[in-house]
Swiss-Prot record:
Protein name: Zinc finger protein 439
Pfam families with a match to the protein in the record: KRAB, zf-C2H2
GO CC terms of this entry: nucleus
Lineage of source species: Eukaryota, Metazoa, Chordata, Craniata, Vertebrata
This protein's record includes keyword Transferase: no
Zinc finger (C2H2-type): 186-208, 214-236, 242-264, 270-292, 298-320, 326-348, 354-376, 382-404, 410-432, 438-460, 466-490
Protein family per UniProt: Belongs to the krueppel C2H2-type zinc-finger protein family.
SMART domains in the cross-refs: KRAB (SM00349), ZnF_C2H2 (SM00355)
Annotated function: May be involved in transcriptional regulation.
Subcellular location, record wording: Nucleus
SS bonds (residue pairs): none
Length: 499
């Protein structure tokens, strides 16, 4: 019988009986293997890899962590890999250890047969854990024992700089180090997605190429492996096999289900290195960290608007191609989504369904309301390095930074005047078009912006929000209030001189 890999034993801490990979692997004879074409051999490797990940996902701890690497590189010379950079010291070392090569007689493990008497032991494993928490490949051992030595293969020569994990091969070491540091050295040229492993980016590129043996009957999208194809089908069928025991909410993907469960227990394992804010998922944390840098690397080809992640720019680009089904009868503005249309209508009607419990201020949309709530919490995670001023929102922070740099990236095509923000440019544009979308219900007077309408309505309501603390006099407009304060200060100064 021919097997592309050695028999790999995995053990579970709960059970002491060894289980061989051959129990679940499919093997071919020399004659059968010769009859397979390249695509069939590739499919075989994919199935074996899926089997490996399925087994690790149910809590098995493999003796050899290198199976995935081997199946993707079936003819790889392990000796050359091991001898490569044998004395390299990692730049991000945590303990300062160097790596030493393994003796030659230890490299020929493929020629050996696994002994059925090899039993599991409470070996010391890395306490930091791999990046993929779902696989549960790391099971904590007894902290009072050293790493055990395999009787068949001997000690593992490559030692991780993070504590308590050893590897037989250098590729496994590099993989584990990346899992700790979170480094993703490979980026997709098509969508910008960052990926940890070179083999994974090759698989990812299949998504863009449209090639793959598994084709979706609903949309025609092709996939390189069966598991991804089955997961994708759920987007069409609406199947949600993962149900939350706490609230009954169902999910299509196990990863989404795990992230949701953290909202119940309050677990936030991903922390921002800049401000210490914690998050349920790594994606949320990564997106938040970008907001500190003000980084908006992904730009819309149609209008030039920039976004922090490719998902946002793809969603935005649809607004250009999508039909604008919802048209406002008051101002004629057309919108592509119902929620945007409903929010827009509230600007005309003055309806503000989202009210702040702290100050009573009302808002048109939930997003504006959530943004406002941060002003009461006092949380200001965005700090200017130039002057030290802190901000609640990343947008306000970026706008402020432009006051230092003098940058005005938004230019009017009509007159060439430049502005620091897109809303300011949009408001200026109405001076050319004469558009006044905000109309007063009381007198019919129209205005270019919602803030102008809000100020105007004080005439009808009699509202005077600006009150002088010294004399108690109230004002409708902030300009009048500030002028009054200056006169009060001047009067006080003159009064002091007469004394």
């Amino acid at each position: 019988m021919l097997s592309l890999s050695p028999i790999l034993l995995y053990t579970c801490e709960m059970f002491q009986d060894p289980v061989a990979f051959k129990d679940v692997a499919v093997n071919f004879t020399q004659e059968e293997w010769a009859l397979l074409d390249i695509s069939q051999k590739n499919l075989y490797r994919e199935v074996m890899l899926e089997t490996f990940w399925n087994l690790t996902s149910i809590g098995k701890k493999w003796k050899d962590q290198n199976i995935e690497y081997e199946y993707q590189n079936p003819r790889r010379n392990f000796r050359s890999v091991t001898e490569e950079k044998v004395n390299e010291i990692k730049e991000d070392s945590h303990c300062g250890e160097t790596f030493t090569p393994v003796p030659d007689d230890r490299l020929n493990f493929q020629k050996k047969k696994a002994s059925p008497e090899v039993k599991s032991c409470d070996s010391f494993v890395c306490e930091v854990g791999l990046g993929n928490s779902s696989s549960n490949m790391n099971i904590r051992g007894d902290t009072g024992h050293k790493a055990c030595e395999c009787q068949e293969y001997g000690p593992k020569p490559w030692k991780s700089q993070q504590p308590k994990k050893a590897f037989r091969y250098h590729p496994s070491l590099r993989t584990q180090e990346r899992d700790h540091t979170g480094k993703k050295p490979y980026a997709c040229k098509e969508c910008g997605k960052n990926i940890i492993y070179h083999s994974s980016i090759q698989r990812h590129m299949v998504v863009h190429s449209g090639d793959g043996p598994y084709k979706c009957k609903f949309c025609g999208k092709a996939f390189h492996c069966l598991s991804l194809y089955l997961i994708h089908e759920r987007t069409h069928t609406g199947e949600k096999p993962y149900e939350c025991k706490q609230c009954g909410k169902s999910f299509s993907y196990s990863a989404t289900h795990r992230i949701h469960e953290r909202t119940h227990i309050g677990e936030k394992p991903y922390e921002c290195q800049e401000c210490g804010k914690a998050f349920h998922s790594p994606r949320s944390c990564h997106r938040h960290e970008r907001s500190h840098m003000g980084e908006k690397a992904y730009q819309c080809k149609e209008c030039g608007k920039a976004f922090m992640c490719p998902r946002y720019v793809r969603r935005h680009e649809r607004t250009h191609s999508r039909k604008k089904l919802y048209e406002c009868k008051q101002c004629g503005k057309a919108l592509s989504s119902l929620t945007s249309f409903q929010t827009h209508i509230r600007m005309h009607s003055g309806e503000r369904p989202y009210e702040c419990k702290t100050c009573g201020k009302g808002f048109y949309s939930a997003k504006s309301f959530q943004r406002h709530e941060k002003t009461h919490s006092g949380e200001k995670p965005y700090k200017c390095k130039q002057c030290g001023k802190a901000f609640t929102r990343s947008g306000s922070f970026r706008y402020h930074e432009r006051t230092h740099t003098g940058e005005k990236p938004y230019e009017c095509k009509q007159c060439g005047k430049a502005f620091r923000s897109a809303p300011n440019l949009q408001l200026h544009g109405r001076t050319h078009t004469g558009e006044k979308p905000y109309q007063c219900k009381e007198c019919g007077k129209a205005f270019r912006s919602a803030s102008q309408l809000r100020i105007h309505r004080r005439i009808h309501t009699g509202e005077k929000p600006y009150e002088c603390k010294k004399c108690g006099k109230a004002f409708r407009y902030v300009q009048n209030f500030r002028f009054h304060e200056r006169t009060q200060t001047h009067k006080n100064a003159l009064w002091r001189k007469t004394l």
